[in-house]
């Protein structure tokens, strides 16, 4: 979780994050749901579906009870399906239930690419598209630092950004 939070640093603006009880959700405007089973080696995100649906069947009614007007953001795997599960379990309208999709993956991509180039991830603009997970795509062709293509910047800085390095970054983003 700490790694996820650090990878999300480019998006933070002084948020208040606490660990508490369901009753602490009273009057919450936005609730981020990260609960779920851990992915074991060899398991796919889809393998987590049955376990996480069971977990959500216990969580979502409590969330609805204490925060019936909140916006829900789902960040549990498989995130796209769990967002739909949350929508159905909550009974909330579609405009109040969102999944993180590849937002965290894009933040990881920016963070890891920034670290590799030795620059702030806040200067890196790079996206991951598609379904969160094994089929997601890192969009290298539009990755920039400021207004400079990352390949050009890497060359100017004397940093490798060849197929091997890109593969390593891709692997780190997917498997973080």
Q: Where does each model-flagged region fall?
A:
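Conserved NAD(P)H cofactor-binding loop of Rossmann-fold oxidoreductase domains
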Residues: 35-37
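N-terminal glycine-rich phosphate/adenylate-binding segment common to multiple enzyme folds
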Residues: 39-41
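Rossmann-like NAD(P)(H) cofactor-binding subdomain of soluble oxidoreductases
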Residues: 44-110
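C-terminal substrate-binding/catalytic lobe of Rossmann-fold NAD(P)-dependent dehydrogenases
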Residues: 90-96, 104-176
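Short, well-ordered amphipathic alpha-helical segments that serve as non-catalytic structural scaffolds
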Residues: 4, 31, 56-59
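Redox-cofactor binding/interface segments in oxidoreductases and associated redox assembly factors
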Residues: 31-33, 74-75
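Conserved N-terminal Rossmann-fold NAD(P) cofactor-binding segment
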Residues: 1-29, 43
């Amino acid at each position: 979780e700490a790694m996820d939070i650090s990878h999300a640093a480019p998006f933070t603006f002084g948020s208040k994050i606490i660990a508490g009880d369901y009753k602490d959700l009273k009057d919450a405007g936005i609730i981020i749901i990260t609960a779920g089973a851990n992915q074991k080696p060899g398991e796919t995100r889809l393998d987590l579906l049955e376990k996480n649906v069971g977990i959500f069947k216990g969580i979502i009614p409590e969330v609805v009870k204490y925060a019936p007007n909140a916006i829900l953001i789902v960040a549990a795997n498989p995130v796209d399906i769990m967002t739909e599960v949350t929508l159905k379990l909550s009974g909330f309208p579609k405009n109040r239930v969102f999944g993180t999709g590849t937002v965290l993956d894009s933040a990881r991509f920016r963070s890891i690419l920034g670290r590799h180039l030795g620059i702030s991830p806040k200067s890196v603009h790079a996206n991951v598209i598609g379904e969160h997970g094994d089929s997601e795509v890192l969009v290298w062709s539009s990755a920039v630092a400021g207004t400079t293509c990352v390949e050009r910047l890497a060359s100017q800085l004397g940093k490798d950004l060849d197929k091997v390095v890109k593969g390593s970054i891709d692997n780190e983003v997917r498997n973080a």
